């Protein structure tokens, strides 16, 4: 049973999402509707994109805590370009390139300069946030064109164009990681760095690609944020990095690298977003959101740690079972045979 749970974390995450959707329905039947699902998905798109990028980094046994700042910086660039008169396609491409460049810089610090990922990205977290504030002067960016907001308008089945793009990206990345040699290189790099090198995997390049794509996903999340809100705050993206990591852990992405799936991270992002909608239904103040999400994350981390320890004990017991088998007992001679011998 323990091995099944460890090997099928996506199923347990899906069950958690289903339960969190069904149980509030007993309080309000209107909650159980397609409209609720589309609303939750619309709210979850930013976190889903960030969780997909974070998955790539975590699979290589690294972590990136700067994605919130990258999201904010890229959203600011998008707003500045649009207000300067550039077309939406040009502004979006420039925004994605900035995210890619920011992620590449993070990857170069980790792969080439051998700086620990948590230290490197803590530094760039402040760097990118500072660039964002320098560009805006600490002010909001408003007056964004209506065509940007159309990206988040319902298009088909209540889902926006950018929502369908997110679904396509999820499917593509799930296929890439599961079915291609390039995708398996991420797992190999995180599972055994030296072994991957001996197999010919270019581990430095893989880590740089992981960070670069993570930055690109953060930039896309910035575009989604701007299109949904319609303006850009001077604190856009603050705290999103922790939620992205939490979504990955909830979905079964190992902090030790080398295991997990994109689908699990997506379900984790959905679960965290759905918590917010349930709290609204229960009329619980919004400042409880982070507290409850933190409790859920701690519970999952404790469960994950206990599960890993239990599996290791079982594997150790199976490995040394033949050395621990007691010797066959020798039956004592019967009293009759003893008398004859006498």
From Swiss-Prot:
GO terms for cellular component: plasma membrane. Residues 1-13, 60-69, 114, 176-212, 273-283 are periplasmic. Keywords: Cell inner membrane, Cell membrane, Membrane, Transmembrane, Transmembrane helix, Transport. InterPro entries: ABC_transp_permease. It is a multi-pass membrane protein. It is found in: Cell inner membrane. Residues 35-38, 91-92, 136-154, 234-251, 305-342 are cytoplasmic. Coiled coil: none annotated. Pfam families: BPD_transp_2. The keyword Cell cycle does not apply. One of its GO terms (molecular function) is transmembrane transporter activity. CDD domains: TM_PBP1_transp_AraH_like (cd06579). The chain crosses the membrane at residues 14-34, 39-59, 70-90, 93-113, 115-135, 155-175, 213-233, 252-272, 284-304. Belongs to the binding-protein-dependent transport system permease family. AraH/RbsC subfamily. Part of the ABC transporter complex LsrABCD involved in autoinducer 2 (AI-2) import. Probably responsible for the translocation of the substrate across the membrane. The complex is composed of two ATP-binding proteins (LsrA), two transmembrane proteins (LsrC and LsrD) and a solute-binding protein (LsrB). This is Autoinducer 2 import system permease protein LsrC.
